[in-house]
Amino acid sequence: SAMGFRTRDAAKAFKNAIELGAEPMYSQAGPMELNIPAIKGIGGMPIFLVDRDIYENDFIFFDDVEKNPRGAGLNEIDHLTHNVYKGRMDYWANFYEKIFNFQEIRYFDIKGEYTGLTSKALTAPDGMIRIPLNEDSDKGNGQIAEFLADFNGEGIQHIAFITDDLVSTWDKLKGLGLKFMTPPPET
């Protein structure tokens, strides 16, 4: 997986991130591909830094195509939840605070009979990017540990979207063939 942040000046943002301690990631661009600066994020995932629409050179709309279609009703990303190993939540919170000037806006300590987790919710300075960081509670055998085992380490657990009409969006996505997870049984 990968993630990208849009910035005014990708080269400058990359240089600043490296100076602040981020680890650079380099890729070999193929013919007709762009070399996009990236730093190493959670689970070794690249965080690309872009300063323009990287697709504007590759795609030109036909005259009769809607340039901003309504789609299924997913308006924007609300948050990207990251699951991390026990004891690594503060490390990654500091990473986002130091490199991108994020701020912690909420802390949760969720305790359950069988599972529990702690979470720090971070937001970008403009409030447009929200990243909750989750780690297992002291029990260490809950949903976070299960995710880390199933997906071979730290990473994005889920992406939440904002919609004006959840039921309509659900119906449209289902009609387009999207498969939904089976909800857990009620207890």
Task: Please place each PLM-identified region on the residue numbering.
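Aromatic side chains
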Residues: F95-Y96, F102, F147, F180, ...
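Short hydrophobic/aromatic-rich motifs at helix boundaries and adjacent loops
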Residues: V65-E66, W92, N141-G142
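Short amphipathic alpha-helical segments, especially helix-boundary/capping motifs
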Residues: N68-G71, Y96-E97, Q143-F147
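Vicinal oxygen chelate
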Residues: A2-D78, H82-V84, R106-S137, F161, ...
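Extended non-catalytic domains of envelope/secretory-pathway proteins
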Residues: K86, A93, D150-F151, G155
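Flexible internal linker/loop segments at domain or repeat junctions
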Residues: E135-G153
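Amphipathic alpha-helical segments
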Residues: N16-L20, M89-Q103
